[in-house]
Structures are given as structure tokens and as C-alpha cells.
Regions:
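Domain-level signal for soluble alpha/beta catalytic cores
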Residues: 1-298
Length: 298
């Protein structure tokens, strides 16, 4: 049996559900501002469900997301708030690691909008330098193209922390990134670029297993954490979308999601958890299944 790292679930959607506020383009960043302490509470609930990682609520804190909003000048302060909430939860829980989350520039699922390399590396570096001193890991999330992978590794790996590269794949063909490029082609980029693990994230559960199979050539740890959306809609691919463009799957119970996760573990995944719409109940069910199968959660 294996040692499995159990990630937390989806912070952003969990905050949306708890706050009950109408979603805005600032998404979870807005809720962190409007509801102090709610992010800490979500982190604590994921820890209580046996997650061993708290992923910072920093995915969407980029200059391009803040431009034209009342918090345009709060880039650094927002990162510090996200770190404070995660560290507070870990302290109160008594254990766990903190993963500093870095999301895509400009928009999720839009590799066509990724900036030129020089600009992208500089922007990612600015985020990574804010997060790294307070984190155990940097997790580069929803990486949708090979250029995105190269650029974010160039920005994060030199800081000296383990860097987990999390790729997002085509929901209909998990062997392909959302750019259309082959997942397998990300393996040498990750290995040569200094990544410590390759994950698949923010894709349908059904797409994760083919993606993991496409990573079979790597010597790095692999893993996955899916979302619970029916599909990524055209409306969500517009400029400055809100999550009310997306719909939760009806078959996304903790039990059914854990079924998917256990197939990934059986295929060699050693880092698992959840993305958007995966809550503490899903993580608790995964923990129960892992232990029942004799795995150790680390």
C-alpha cells in the first residue's frame, strides 16, 4: 500500500456556497474581503476532513484580475491575507502543510490568452516571491499549455521550494491539454524544469485517468484533483466571467467522487484531492476509502 498526500478541495466554490453572495469576477478574492475568517474556517474544515495540505486562496490574485476594481492596489496585501488565513488554520489544527496556489494569468482555460514568455515569467515570479516565504510547496494550477508550463516553472523553481505542476486537460480527451497539445509532451518540460510532481486538476473526473496514463513516462510523483462542473461553458470563457456560468453535476456525491479518486490511486497517483465543487465531505470520504484500502495519508 502507498503513502498518499491528501489535498484539500475547492476553496473558491466552497466560499461561494457559504457566503451566499452573488458571484463577482473577483470570485473567492471578493469573499475573502467581505467575510473575514471564512477562508480560515474552510481550511480548518478541510483539515478536519483529513486533508494534509491547505492550498492558499491566492489562485485568482493577479494584477490582470484586479485591474479596474476597488482593490487594484492591494495585490501584495491580498496575498498576505490569503497566507494569514491558511497559516491560522494550520496553527489551530496543529499540523499540515501550506501550498501556495498560483493560477493562470488573464483567465482560466484560455491558453490563447497566455502572455509572451518574458511577461509571464515576470508576473508569475512576483506572485511566487510573495507566497514562498510562508509556504511549504508552490502549486501551479490549471496549467493549460506547454508554454504556460515552461513559464511558471521558470518563475517558481528557482525559489527553492517543491513545485507541483497541475495541468488542466480537455474534458473530452484527457490525453490533451486544453491547448490541444499532448499531455505526454509536458513530462520532459516538468522534469527538465525542476517540478517535484505532476498533477491533473480542474477537469472532469472522467478525464483524469486518461491524463494520468499519459504521464506514465515520468519518474515524478503524479496525482489528480477534479472539478464537479458539468462542463466549461462558452459563457465562462468570456472576458471576466463569474462562476454562475457553471453548473454543478448531479452525480457529484462524495461517494461517487471517491470512486473516481480510488481508480487514480490504483493507477499510481500518490497526490489526490479536489478542485471546484469538492467540499470537506468529499475529502472525508476519500480519506475513509484510502485508509480502508490500507493506504497511509501523509
Amino acid at each position: 500500500m502507498a503513502e498518499i498526500t491528501l489535498l484539500d478541495g475547492g476553496m473558491g466554490q466552497e466560499l461561494v456556497h457559504r457566503a451566499g453572495d452573488r458571484p463577482t469576477p473577483l470570485w473567492s478574492t471578493q469573499i475573502m474581503l467581505d467575510h473575514p475568517g471564512m477562508v480560515t474556517a474552510v481550511h480548518k474544515d478541510f483539515f478536519a476532513a483529513d486533508a494534509t495540505i491547505a492550498t492558499t486562496n491566492s489562485y485568482a490574485i493577479h494584477h490582470d484580475r484586479l485591474t479596474g476594481t476597488p482593490v487594484e492596489g492591494a495585490f501584495s496585501a491580498l496575498h498576505q491575507s490569503a497566507l494569514y488565513e491558511a497559516r491560522t488554520a494550520r496553527r489551530e489544527h496543529g499540523s499540515g502543510r501550506i501550498a501556495g496556489a498560483i493560477g493562470p494569468l488573464r483567465a482560466s482555460y484560455r491558453p490563447d490568452l497566455h502572455p509572451e514568455s518574458e511577461e509571464a515569467v515576470a508576473l508569475f515570479t512576483e506572485v511566487a516571491e510573495l507566497l514562498a516565504p510562508a509556504c511549504d510547496i508552490l502549486i501551479c494550477e490549471t496549467v493549460a499549455s506547454l508554454n504556460h508550463a515552461r513559464d511558471i516553472l521558470a518563475a517558481t523553481v528557482p525559489l527553492g521550494l517543491p513545485v507541483w505542476l497541475a495541468l488542466t486537460v480537455d474534458d473530452r480527451d484527457g490525453s490533451r491539454l486544453r491547448s490541444g497539445e499532448a499531455v505526454a509532451d509536458a513530462v520532459p518540460i516538468a522534469q527538465d524544469g525542476g517540478a517535484s510532481a505532476i498533477l491533473i486538476n480542474c477537469s472532469t473526473p472522467e478525464a483524469i485517468l486518461p491524463a494520468l496514463n499519459a504521464l506514465s513516462g515520468t519518474t515524478l510523483p503524479i496525482g489528480g484533483y477534479a472539478n464537479g462542473f458539468e462542463q466549461i461553458t462558452e459563457g465562462f470563457l468570456d472576458d471576466k466571467p463569474t462562476v454562475d456560468s457553471l453548473t454543478l453535476r448531479r452525480d457529484f456525491t462524495p461517494e461517487l467522487y471517491a470512486d473516481h479518486v480510488m481508480t487514480w490511486v490504483a493507477s499510481g497517483a500518490t497526490i489526490v484531492g479536489g478542485c471546484c465543487e469538492v467540499g470537506p465531505a468529499h475529502i472525508a470520504e476519500i480519506a475513509k476509502r484510502l485508509r480502508a484500502d490500507g493506504h497511509t495519508i501523509v
